[in-house]
Amino acid sequence: MSRVEPIKKVSVVIPVYNEQESLPALLERTTAACKQLTQPYEIILVDDGSSDNSADMLTAAAEQPGSCVIAVLLNRNYGQHSAIMAGFNQVSGDLVITLDADLQNPPEEIPRLVKVAEEGYDVVGTVRANRQDSWFRKSASRIINMMIQRATGKSMGDYGCMLRAYRRHIIEAMLNCHERSTFIPILANTFARRTTEIEVLHAEREFGDSKYSLMKLINLMYDLITCLTTTPLRLLSVVGSVVALSGFLLAVLLIALRLIMGPEWSGGGVFTLFAVLFTFIGAQFVGMGLLGEYIGRIYTDVRARPRYFVQKVVGEQPNHNTQEEE
């Protein structure tokens, strides 16, 4: 068994987008939780182009004397996972913990994550106990988790919970990946050797609404499908073969029925032919849409634009980049 590397410093990365109401409690509770650790710590909050006063509040927190807060300000909104990657580029700890800013997952769970990670795990995931979300969000999350488990082979039960802990070598591996669309829990598990999950508390959102609208959830599902696997492309070939064979057999059946039952019967078959035709056309459009998703991602990757651009870092540590490395 390999030697377990000690954790000498803990970094907490929190993406923030229009969370000015929850920030005071978030800073207070996260700092209090980190003070329970035996290791030094830093709290990196990434403002993802907020339109409220979140950026100013983060800057003020980072500028306080003796503050362990680092404020990373992005020039616009790039999305939750890109913001977390920007935070990863600033960390100096041996263990990195991610946390949402809405306080649905309590920061008080941080010491537990550190304790479990000290047992030698590369990734410590979490499962939300008594999840306080709508039926729709729970159902969508359940479907997405099933898809991810089948694609990755990692039997983790709650990929949607961002309260997670990663060893430093996992962070370095993720920073060396330059695909434009990134889902961090999945990407981390592709590099992790030892993973585990623990149950954590989950509270109702106290301030504001979820930043994931229905359209964003749909986009997330497409991102997951196309960034996880090429299986949909293979399925297109299978579906195409099945549809073509079914069409051929149906054509043979219609010809046989016409020969047996006479031309009078065939008049009603026109509508059947139209229905079959529209079915085939619909299948073609679905296939074209999936191909378009993959081609669009290839185009985005070929342009090689940064996933984010950091406008300002307050409390900046030396030798950290303000732009994603290529």
UniProtKB/Swiss-Prot annotation:
Source organism per UniProt: Serratia proteamaculans (strain 568)
Catalytic activity: UDP-4-deoxy-4-formamido-beta-L-arabinose + di-trans,octa-cis-undecaprenyl phosphate = 4-deoxy-4-formamido-alpha-L-arabinopyranosyl di-trans,octa-cis-undecaprenyl phosphate + UDP
Cellular compartments annotated: Cell inner membrane
Family, similarity comment: Belongs to the glycosyltransferase 2 family.
CDD domains the record matches: DPM1_like_bac
Membrane-related topology note: Multi-pass membrane protein
Gene name linked to the record: arnC
Family matches, as HAMAP family: ArnC_transfer (MF_01164)
Main location, first listed in the record: membrane
GO molecular function, one term: undecaprenyl-phosphate 4-deoxy-4-formamido-L-arabinose transferase activity
NCBIfam families membership: PRK10714.1
InterPro entries attached to this UniProt entry: ArnC_tfrase, Glyco_trans_2-like, Glycosyltransferase_2, Nucleotide-diphossugar_trans
GO cellular component: plasma membrane
Gene Ontology biological process terms in this record: 4-amino-4-deoxy-alpha-L-arabinopyranosyl undecaprenyl phosphate biosynthetic process; lipid A biosynthetic process; lipopolysaccharide biosynthetic process; response to antibiotic
Name under which the protein is recorded: Undecaprenyl-phosphate 4-deoxy-4-formamido-L-arabinose transferase
Gene3D superfamilies given in the database record: Spore Coat Polysaccharide Biosynthesis Protein SpsA, Chain A
This enzyme's EC code(s): 2.4.2.53
Class in the EC hierarchy, top level: transferase
Keyword Transferase: yes
Keyword terms: Antibiotic resistance, Cell inner membrane, Cell membrane, Glycosyltransferase, Lipid A biosynthesis, Lipid biosynthesis, Lipid metabolism, Lipopolysaccharide biosynthesis, Membrane, Transferase, Transmembrane, Transmembrane helix
Sections of the chain in a coiled coil: none
Pathway named in the protein's UniProt entry: Glycolipid biosynthesis; 4-amino-4-deoxy-alpha-L-arabinose undecaprenyl phosphate biosynthesis; 4-amino-4-deoxy-alpha-L-arabinose undecaprenyl phosphate from UDP-4-deoxy-4-formamido-beta-L-arabinose and undecaprenyl phosphate: step 1/2; Bacterial outer membrane biogenesis; lipopolysaccharide biosynthesis
Described purpose of this protein according to its UniProt entry: Catalyzes the transfer of 4-deoxy-4-formamido-L-arabinose from UDP to undecaprenyl phosphate. The modified arabinose is attached to lipid A and is required for resistance to polymyxin and cationic antimicrobial peptides.
Pfam families in the cross-refs: Glycos_transf_2
Transmembrane segments: 235-255, 270-290
